[in-house]
From Swiss-Prot:
Belongs to the MCM family. Keywords: ATP-binding, Cell cycle, DNA replication, DNA-binding, Helicase, Hydrolase, Nucleotide-binding, Nucleus. The gene is ROA1. SMART domains: AAA, MCM. One of its GO terms (cellular component) is nucleus. A motif (Arginine finger) lies at residues 472-475. The keyword Glycoprotein does not apply. Residues 290-497 form the MCM domain. It catalyses: ATP + H2O = ADP + phosphate + H(+). It comes from Zea mays (Maize). This is DNA replication licensing factor MCM3 homolog 1. Residues 672-682 have a biased composition (Gly residues).
């Protein structure tokens, strides 16, 4: 024991020398003065300063911290008492924590092996569970009424570094057998809390469960973090015997006894930007086709859906979050939903977001509950205490949550995410726990229509089957349809076949994103930012000429670009952009009020106005601008109009109308007669509004679907079951931008009759 005391004294002198010499020009002495002035009881020592003073001492502190924690605490306490004798009461001491680089002792919960037991480690992860803060008795004081004496007893468990562990027997009688009365007011306690820390989702091994480590925090470290926080905890890794099994069975549970907890920002895993990277980003942002370039670079294995890919790019960039002085929180994250027929690559788009976004968590509607997405109150298996456990949306704070099969979720569970999508917090009031957790994440959901496939004769709201209170929280809602077009089907089949034939030079299959990941492993600053042309991957783009060949960014550079634009660019609205947003919002409201065809996919509310602002800000981020211009608002409105009003049909109709007008003008200039379309032509020689050919029976599939949708919406809106062909012709030509001829109307109605959707007799159409 004397040798132990001598060693402790030597270690204490070593730390006193460190504080006296104070590498860093008085940093630690000033820190001790601030600690005394602010009534704090913990001093953080930097490992770099300790290494500069005594390299051997720093190594021994990391390898055998149990021998040095108490001497370090005694040394700091002595210095504090010299500065202010009244700072510490009798028996009190200043605690010591460590920070700085730990070399290979900086690990994740997955890397904690048995070789680290008994050493000091720095573990980084995300807090998933927090127990309640409980008092732990340090010294009990008892009074004997017979003798009038006081008796005190100290308690130390195996987690303590000061002295040896003591027994937990609570005294009820003194040595003479006299009864003792506990003086609770004179007893001393310390706060105690247990945390569960899990490895961060983006760094966890694919296909494996994330590892978790229990952390014990005491005194001033309690309540310094909450579920969902990313932390770096420095502590001693120890093995403790279980309460039920003990040390006889040889089964121990391991815990991390913390001495310092540091909150990490969300940029802990940020990529490193070189000067060449910044130069290339500026060049990309100055291009006129930056939006199309990023959209085409996202998930090149998915054919088409360019507008949806553009929206996903804006979603990952996000707007600017605002916290006003009056406490109002304006979210900057963008929420998006895709509803459509099966096999239109909705789930594949979600997987693409998982690969590109810096932080993304994936879940499904049927496999998720409301508490699993938000937060839950659970019971500790050993102590029975209540603890707060974070859900998927809390863990994805500052990230993206991908929810597939959104329509399969129960209504009760779906209501739980209403607060997250607008207020971006999770409020829990259960089992005596009332807490509010941050869930500042974007939500991208995919769902199937209520009838399995999308019915064009019904309004979008009836197809989706979700309440308006939830739909209005989505900034964008895309209707993804499986259109039967022979030309498009041919292109999709060729694209899918090329994906399956995409192989390496040696004949083995390889990842579609091989180029991107190869660039990630290459640390060359001059690495190419564009994916090299590959016939199997890019098809026959080169045959169409270099100008039409679509450039695609590598995965590595796309990640860097999105991360840089999202976190380092904070645009602000200009007066011109604000006026244009207000005018556009008024036009959208007016258009939705006068819509006779059932409106668009989303209700136009005040949330739509905020959506325009967020989308415009995201587009300004993409262009690396610090101001939102009118052009950004125009680009945002294009995406919003596409999502709400299916602009793909309108653009096609406008194109066909222009072609028809050009044909009519050419025939008029040539002196042709009978070139006007009066709706009663039947010769088949008149110029018609078709994609290919010139006869009335060659009507495009999109025009047929648009006709059926207009007819179905008119029937539902007016509650009628029959109309004359003349009335139908007038109605569709009044609602459509490109008119239909009489022969086209009759041709489409005959197709609907063959499909048993209508019945035609004597010029009257009865809706079945």
């Amino acid at each position: 024991m004397e040798i132990n005391e001598e060693a402790m004294a030597a270690h204490k002198r070593a730390f006193l020398d460190f504080l006296d010499q104070d590498v860093g020009k008085g940093v630690y002495m000033q820190a001790v003065r601030d600690m005394v002035q602010n009534k704090r009881h913990r001093l953080i020592i930097g490992m770099d300063d300790l290494r500069n003073h005594n390299l051997d001492l720093a190594r021994r502190v990391i390898r055998t911290p149990g021998e040095y924690m108490q001497p370090a605490s005694d040394a700091v306490s002595e210095v504090a008492r010299n500065l202010d004798p009244k700072f510490l009461k009798e028996g009190e001491r200043v605690m010591v924590g460590f920070s700085g680089p730990f070399g290979f002792h900086r690990v994740t919960p997955r890397d904690l092996m048995s070789s680290f037991i008994g050493t000091m480690v720095c573990v980084e992860g995300i807090v998933t569970k927090c127990s309640l803060v409980r008092p732990k008795v340090v010294k009990s004081v008892h009074f004997c009424p017979v003798t009038g004496d006081f008796l005190s007893r100290e308690y130390r468990d195996i987690t303590s570094f000061v002295g040896l562990p003591t027994g937990s027997v609570y005294p009820t009688r003194d040595d003479n057998g006299n009864l003792l009365v506990t003086e609770y007011g004179m007893c001393e306690y310390k706060d105690h809390q247990t945390l569960s820390m899990q490895e961060v989702p983006e760094n966890s091994a694919p296909g494996q469960l994330p590892r978790t480590v229990d952390v014990i925090v005491e005194d001033d470290l309690v309540d310094c973090c909450k579920p969902g926080d990313r932390v770096s905890i420095v502590g001693v890794y120890k093995a403790l015997p279980g309460k039920s099994k003990g040390s006889v069975s040889g089964v121990f549970r391991t815990v991390l006894i913390a001495n310092n907890v540091s909150l990490l920002n969300k940029e802990a895993n940020a990529p490193v930007y070189t000067r060449e990277d910044l130069k290339r980003m500026k060049e990309i942002s100055r291009r006129n086709d930056t939006f199309d370039l990023l959209g085409n670079s996202l998930a090149p294995s998915i054919y088409g859906h360019l507008w949806i890919k553009k929206a996903v790019v804006l979603l990952m960039l996000g707007g600017v979050e605002k916290n006003l002085k009056n406490g109002t929180h304006l979210r900057g994250d963008i929420n998006m939903m895709m509803v459509g027929d099966p096999s239109v690559a909705k789930s594949q788009l979600l997987r693409a977001v998982m690969n590109i976004a810096p932080l993304a968590i994936s879940t499904t509607g049927r496999g998720s509950s409301g508490v699993g997405l938000t937060a839950a109150v659970t019971s500790d298996q050993e102590t029975g205490e209540r603890r707060l456990e974070a859900g998927a949306m809390v863990l994805a704070d500052r990230g993206v949550v991908c929810i597939d099969e959104f329509d399969k979720m129960n209504d009760q569970d779906r209501v739980a995410i209403h607060e997250v999508m607008e207020q971006q917090t999770v409020t829990i009031a259960k089992a005596g726990i009332h807490a509010s957790l941050n869930a500042r994440c974007s939500v991208i959901a995919a769902a199937n229509p209520i009838y399995g496939t999308y019915d064009r004769s019904l309004t979008p709201t009836k197809n989706i089957g979700l309440p308006d209170s939830l739909l209005s929280r989505f900034d964008l809602l895309f209707i993804v349809l499986d259109q039967m077009d022979p030309e498009i089907d041919r292109q999709i089949s060729e694209h899918v076949a090329r994906m399956h034939r995409y192989c390496t030079d040696d004949g083995g299959a390889r990842s579609l994103d091989k180029e991107g990941y190869a660039e990630e492993d290459d640390g060359d600053a001059n690495a190419a930012i564009f994916v090299k042309y590959d016939r199997m991957l890019h098809g026959q783009d080169r045959r169409r000429g270099k100008k039409s060949k679509q450039d695609r960014l590598t995965v590595k550079f796309l990640k860097k670009y999105i991360h840089y634009a999202k976190n380092l660019i904070q645009p602000r609205l200009t007066d011109e952009a604000s006026d244009h947003i207000a005018t556009s919002y008024a036009e959208l409201r007016d258009g939705s009020a006068n819509a006779k065809s059932g409106g668009g996919t989303l209700p136009i509310t005040a949330r739509t106005l905020e959506s325009i602002i967020r989308l415009s800000t995201a587009h300004a981020k993409m262009k690396l601008r610090h101001e939102v211009l009118k052009s950004d608002v125009e680009a945002a409105l294009q995406v919003l109009n596409f999502a709400i009003y299916h602009k793909e049909l309108t653009e096609m109709e406008e194109r066909e109308q222009k072609e028809m007008e050009m044909k009519q003008q050419a025939e008029h200039d040539a002196g042709a007669t009978g070139g006007t379309v009066d709706g009663h032509g039947s010769s088949g020689n008149d110029p018609m509004d078709v994609d290919v050919g010139s006869n009335d029976q060659n009507v495009s599939a999109e025009r047929i679907e648009a006709f059926e949708a207009l007819l179905g919406q008119h029937v539902l809106a007016n509650h009628i079951d029959q109309m004359s062909i003349d009335e139908i012709e007038q109605m569709v030509n009044r609602e459509s931008t490109a008119p239909y001829t009489r022969s086209q109307v009759e041709f489409i109605l005959e197709r609907m009759q063959d499909a048993n959707r209508v019945m035609i007799r004597d010029g009257v159409v009865r809706i079945i």
